[in-house]
């Protein structure tokens, strides 16, 4: 339960964002925190999408897992890069 800074980029956008997330946030919550900076601003919403998915080093993460749970499985430094995209 502590703030953790990440860099999030929505796939298709050219602007990465510094996003403060909590280690108790789920991956789905992190996706929303990143997407809010892009979807509806520089990219239109996708009406066929069922939500968002988060990629870390090209691997899709489980949306229900917390950041803390992911951090126990792999080394993660502040300002870690996360990609977010529409889930089809």
UniProtKB/Swiss-Prot annotation:
Matches recorded under CDD domains: Ubl_TmoB
Keywords: Cytoplasm, Monooxygenase, NAD, Oxidoreductase, Plasmid
Catalytic activity: propene + NADH + O2 + H(+) = 1,2-epoxypropane + NAD(+) + H2O
Enzyme Commission number(s) from the entry: 1.14.13.69
Highest rank taxon of the organism: Bacteria
Pfam families: TmoB
InterPro entries referenced in this protein's UniProt entry, alphabetically: TmoB-like_sf (IPR036713), Toluene_mOase_B (IPR009355)
GO molecular function, one term: alkene monooxygenase activity
UniProt record similarity statement: Belongs to the TmoB/XamoB family.
Entry protein name: Alkene monooxygenase system, oxygenase component subunit gamma
